[in-house]
């Protein structure tokens, strides 16, 4: 009976360690919530006209633009992604993109408005941003020539 308890105890310890290691690997590289601000310079945006000629549902917007720091002076990475036009009348797109920085990537997804600031869901990350969640707000500057992106990231 004592031998059986030792085996059960050993199995429980191994399981606990396994779950503990799994939980440890699921943590983010950032230790506490952070706010990260970058500026996107929209120099490569291209709309692919699909279906009805002109601005119409289903059109695709692609981009691969440079990102600059919060002072908008030093290049810190790139941003690449795409959007599908959902409603020309409402001025909305459904978008997903990845911000690539030296220490990792952050992906976002959600609806984008041509006419107002927009909030996106942070859907994940790599590097020091592994397993982050949170939100990102986009603010158009200079008529959309630049976009201020403010990430609120939670580990």
Question: How would you name each of these model-derived features?
Answer:
Residues 1-9:
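Bacterial N-terminal signal peptides that target proteins for export
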Residues 27-155:
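Beta-strand-enriched cores of mature, soluble protein domains
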Residues 9-20:
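Bacterial N-terminal signal peptides
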């Amino acid at each position: 009976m004592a031998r059986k308890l030792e085996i059960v105890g050993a199995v429980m310890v191994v399981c606990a360690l396994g779950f503990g290691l799994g939980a440890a690997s699921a943590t983010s590289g950032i230790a506490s919530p952070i706010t990260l601000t970058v500026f996107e310079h929209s120099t490569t945006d291209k709309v692919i006209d699909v279906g009805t000629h002109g601005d119409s549902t289903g059109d695709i917007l692609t981009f691969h633009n440079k990102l600059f720091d919060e002072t908008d002076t030093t290049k810190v990475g790139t941003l690449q992604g795409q959007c599908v036009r959902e409603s020309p009348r409402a001025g909305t797109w459904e978008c997903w993109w990845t911000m690539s920085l030296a220490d990792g990537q952050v992906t976002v997804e959600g609806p984008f408005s041509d006419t107002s600031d927009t909030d996106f869901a942070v859907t994940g990350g790599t590097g020091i941003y592994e397993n982050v969640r949170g939100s990102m707000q986009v603010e158009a500057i200079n008529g959309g020539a630049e976009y201020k992106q403010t990430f609120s990231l939670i580990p």
